[in-house]
Structures are given as C-alpha cells and as structure tokens.
C-alpha cells in the first residue's frame, strides 16, 4: 500500500495558553507552515495558531 499524502499536524496557540488543535495537512499542496486564526477557549478570543510537530 502506498503511504497517504496527508500528515497529522498540531496547531498551537500563539497566546501562550498551551491550547492546541490537531488536524491533517496535504504536504504536497502546502509545503509551508500553516498559520490560521481560531478560537482559544482559555484566552476566550480568536488568536493565531501556528503549526508545530506532534511529539
């Protein structure tokens, strides 16, 4: 079987709260690091989430 093109990534809050989301990303279409605005329930506002590695 061939390996899939989608890899699991972790989106970590830049607010410093330690909150994170997990999602998948197609490495062929998006080789750069992802940054997206999402809601941080700890900070109770929308903040930027940056891609980090899943340990």
From Swiss-Prot:
GO terms for biological process: translation. It comes from the Bacteria. InterPro entries: Ribosomal_bL33, Ribosomal_bL33_CS, Ribosomal_bL33_sf, Ribosomal_zn-bd. The keyword Ribosomal protein applies. Pfam families: Ribosomal_L33. Residues 14-24 have a biased composition (Polar residues). The keyword Ribosomal protein applies. Disulfide bonds: none annotated. Transmembrane segments: none annotated. Residues 1-11 have a biased composition (Basic and acidic residues). GO terms for molecular function: structural constituent of ribosome. Keywords: Ribonucleoprotein, Ribosomal protein. Residues 1-24 are annotated as: Disordered. PROSITE patterns: RIBOSOMAL_L33. GO terms for cellular component: cytosolic large ribosomal subunit. Belongs to the bacterial ribosomal protein bL33 family. HAMAP family: Ribosomal_bL33. This is Large ribosomal subunit protein bL33.
């Amino acid at each position: 079987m061939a390996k899939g093109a989608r890899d699991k990534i972790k989106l970590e809050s830049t607010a410093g709260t330690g909150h994170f989301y997990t999602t998948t990303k197609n490495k062929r279409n998006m080789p750069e690091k992802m940054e997206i605005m999402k809601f941080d329930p700890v900070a109770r506002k929308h903040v930027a989430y940056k891609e980090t590695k899943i340990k």
